[in-house]
């Protein structure tokens, strides 16, 4: 969150980061894109999940803000465990709300702006590589 002094007619560049793209199978996810306002205030995209082995993965770290008067970090995604518990991780939350939940046959897309997508699991152990949910796109909120 930041406050900028502007003069009517001033132009500021706005970049809205894309959410991390979905992946299928026991692989690491994709990072989210960075958002920025005027090249001054930045919201870095969240980091991908990290596959440690075929049976577990670490949730990705939340994105880090900089350049604002108040810099709020995004939430970390949940770890996934598949050995005996068969739990996949949910996507990390953002300032705007929660991430996507994990799901059988496919993870759920991030719900709130800037949140992560959930992991997928194969409830029938069929060997099908189901897709994770996409991360939600970032946001740049401006009030005049």
At which residue positions do the language-model features occur?
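Secretome/extracellular-domain signature
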Residues: 1-89
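Extracytoplasmic/periplasmic beta-strand context in beta-sandwich domains
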Residues: 33-35, 111, 138
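A C-terminal functional module that forms or caps the active site or interfaces directly
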Residues: 93-105
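C-terminal, surface-exposed recognition/capping segments
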Residues: 103-136
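Short, structured beta-strand segments at or near domain termini in extracellular proteins/domains
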Residues: 134-144
């Amino acid at each position: 969150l930041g406050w900028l002094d502007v003069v009517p007619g001033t132009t500021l560049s706005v970049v809205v980061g894309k959410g991390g793209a979905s992946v299928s199978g026991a692989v690491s996810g994709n990072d989210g894109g960075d958002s920025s306002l005027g090249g001054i205030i930045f919201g870095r995209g969240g980091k991908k999940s990290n596959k440690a082995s075929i049976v577990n993965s670490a949730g990705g770290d939340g994105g880090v803000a900089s350049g604002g008067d108040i810099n709020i970090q995004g939430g970390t995604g949940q770890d996934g465990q598949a050995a005996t518990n068969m739990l996949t991780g949910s996507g990390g939350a953002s300032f705007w709300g929660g991430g996507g939940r994990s799901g059988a046959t496919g993870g759920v897309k991030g719900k709130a702006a800037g949140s992560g997508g959930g992991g997928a699991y194969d409830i029938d152990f069929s060997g099908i590589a189901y897709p994770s949910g996409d991360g939600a796109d970032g946001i740049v909120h401006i009030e005049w």
